[in-house]
Design a protein with these regions (language model features):
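Short alpha-helical DNA-recognition segment
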Residues: 27-45
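Short basic helix-loop element that most often maps to the first helix and adjoining turn
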Residues: 17-33, 91
Length: 91
């Protein structure tokens, strides 16, 4: 899938949709997840509808859903687009 034309909002909405599906698969209500993660119910509802949330609140939700490992894995493996990037990293 090529995301070159996606906006930040498009990506945020997709993340919200994925998190909502995981929450539902684990049979956790919005109110339960909000309480367990110390994120307000209103914030969680808004996130699931719009994708808008602070990074800290997003991380709290992922921690409660046992997804923090996936967050920690972001950007850990370098993706090079050309040889100059490889050379520059070695400097």
């Amino acid at each position: 899938m090529d995301y070159i034309w996606d906006t930040p909002s498009d990506i945020a909405v997709r993340l919200a949709d994925r998190l909502r599906k995981i929450r539902k698969r684990k049979k956790i209500t919005q109110k339960q997840l909000a309480g367990r993660s110390n994120v307000s119910y209103a914030t969680l509802r808004k996130f699931e509808k719009t994708g808008q949330i602070s990074l800290e609140s997003f991380i709290k939700l992922t921690m409660e859903l046992d997804l923090v490992g996936e967050i920690n894995d972001l950007f850990t493996t370098p993706v090079y687009t050309n040889i100059e990037e490889v050379i520059n990293e070695q400097r």
